[in-house]
Structures are given as structure tokens and as C-alpha cells.
Amino acid sequence: MLDLQKKLSPAFYTILSLPSTAMGFALSVQISALSWILSTQYNLAIHEIGLVWAAGPIAGIFGQVIVGMISDEVWFWGGRRRPFILIGGTLSALMLLALPFIGVISTGLGFESVVGIAILIALTLDLSINISFNPTRSIIADVTPSGNERTKGYTWMQTISGTFGVGAYAIGAIWGNYALIYVGAIIVFLISFIPIWFIKEPEKLSEKEEVLSVTPDKNKWISALFSIKPLWGFLAYAPLGMFKKLSGQSLSPGILELACLLLTVYGIFQVLKQPESEVANQRSNEIGFQRILAAHAFTWMGIQTMFIYMFAFIQNKMNFLSENDLGKVISLSFLLLNAVAAILPAIFLQPLSEKWGKV
């Protein structure tokens, strides 16, 4: 163990924050460049771009759940989090590099359409980011004592990751999205692959953390599936919609959408109808988690719509822009969004929470 880690010095907190920063940076590149490059370089229609984006989050949801379960219980390559960070960081960098070459890859593999390869690359990129997200956060808890030191670790992570995220959009706004893709791939690989070798993980978690990490239900995979009940409709719609599009199958308009909407409403109703106060503590925590999922699901519908389709809005409203300038405007827009998101909580929300209380 390095002296930096023993002393929990600022340098160690910086190193500890970099793997999570890498995943956040990769996500920023994806948000800024994926829709833009699919539209401008590969001429995909707006509904095809939505199809490409649908693949990633589904894999990400399952990836986070699965990796979150198994990363507590494995040990290889000198750690329980290290393998997932190394694999996820390397694959994320490679998939970013693949974005400008989707057409070349598709032609080389003998595909007439780039949609299938674009879905595969987007799927791998999103899955790579998501399988690393939980380990990059869990490693902070693994190597810091509970209390102020652990809180400090997460604070450093948020600060450094947020700064890099704003920096990603700044690169795209100034030099364009192609520069962002190539620079992003290098940064993601370096700050995910190198720092993790300077962090020594404990081979045995503390007794309290072991209890929290072990799911008492023997059928933990089924338990995990039921814990995300409010997302069932969303989870079903994306793969079924992709299959319908790629296979050429036809359904009556709105049938699939209505069925998935009803499934979503059913899942949310099941969560909301049972008061947390009337169930055991562990079940109460699960219900609270499911209610957060329900709220976030609809929130993310709006946010993802902005991420995916903002390029089309700008193309329509500012059709005088060149393809490169379009990419710069998209990056500038997300730069301003993230800058406001970084400043607003400290300046406005914190004073309001102190006045009216936190919820």
C-alpha cells in the first residue's frame, strides 16, 4: 500500500476519483457526439438514431445490477473492483474510437446497413460504461473508513468528475466533436487503466459491508428483477421495438406502446399502493428504492429525449450551420447545462434546503 493511501492524502483522493471520472467523461462524449455522428456521417434517420440509443441503456440497467451483485464476491487481478474498471475502461475507449469508423467496420463485415453495427457499438459502449460505474464508486467505500474520510472521497469524486465532464463539452465546443472523440478515447483509457494500479483493495470487506453486500434471498437474480419492477415496461419496449424494426415485423400502430405503458403503470401502482410504514425495514428500503426508480424513469425520459434528439432540433432551427458547427453548438449547449447544474445546487438549492428542510 502506498503512503498516499495510508495517509489518505489529497493526491490519493485524486487518484481514487479518476476511474469514476473516466466513465463520466466517456458518457459525456457519447451524449455530445453519438447522435451527431450518426446523423451527419452515416445519414441515419431520426427514428434509426433513437433505435441505436435504445440498445445501450437496457444493457446498462442489467449490467449495473449484475456487476453490482458479483463484484462484491470475486477477486482476481489483485482486486474485486479493479477487473471491472480495467475491462470497462478499455472497452469504452475502443468503442469511442470505433464511432468514426462504423461505416468501415460495417462494410468490412459485409453489412449493407450501418444500423446493426451502430447498435452493436452503442450497446458495447453503454454496457462498458455501466459495468464500471458501480465498481468505480464502490472502491471508494472499500478503501476509506466510514465517516468524514469516506464523505470526502465521494466529494472529491463528484468535483473532479464534474470538472472533467464540463471539460469534455468544452473540447467539443471549441475544436469539434471529432477532436472530442479522439481526445476522449485517450483520456478515458489513461485515467481508468493507470490509476487503479496505485490503489490497494482490501481482500476482505469489513463485517458490516459484507452483510450489506450479500443478498439474503437465494434467488437473488429473481429478487433483483422484482426490485426494478417500475422499469419493466421500459425494459420490455426497447428490445421488442428493436426486434420489430430490424426484423421487419409489423404490428398494429400503438399496440406495443400501449402494452408497455400498461406494464409500466402496473409496476408503479404496485409500488405506490403499499405504505412503507406497514412492512419490515428491509422491505421498506426496497419500496423506497422502487419509488425513486419510478420517479427517475419519467424524469430520464425527458432528459434522454434531449440527449438523443437535440441535434435534430438544432438542425431544423439553425439549418445554416455546417456539420462541424452543428457539433460545436451541441457541445456548447451541454457545456452550459452542466455548468449550471454544477453551480445551482451550491448557490440556490443548498440555502433553500437549509430554510425549508431537505426531502
What does each of the following model-derived ranges do?
Residues 1-9, 109, 115-120, 131-132, ...:
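Intracellular loop-helix junctions on the cytosolic face of multi-pass helical membrane proteins
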Residues 2-60, 236, 240-253, 289-320:
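Helix-loop boundary and gating motifs at the non-cytosolic
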Residues 21, 51-58, 123, 155-163, ...:
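Transmembrane alpha-helical cores of Major Facilitator Superfamily
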Residues 29, 33, 66, 133-139, ...:
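Transmembrane alpha-helix boundary/hinge residues in polytopic small-molecule transporters
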Residues 45-53, 81, 114, 118, ...:
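Juxtamembrane helix-start elements in MFS-like secondary transporters
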Residues 59-63, 260-271, 331-351:
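Transmembrane alpha-helices of Major Facilitator/SLC transporters
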Residues 62-79, 176, 343-358:
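Helix-to-loop junctions at the C-terminal end of transmembrane segments
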Residues 85-112, 241-245:
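C-terminal ends and interior cores of transmembrane alpha-helices
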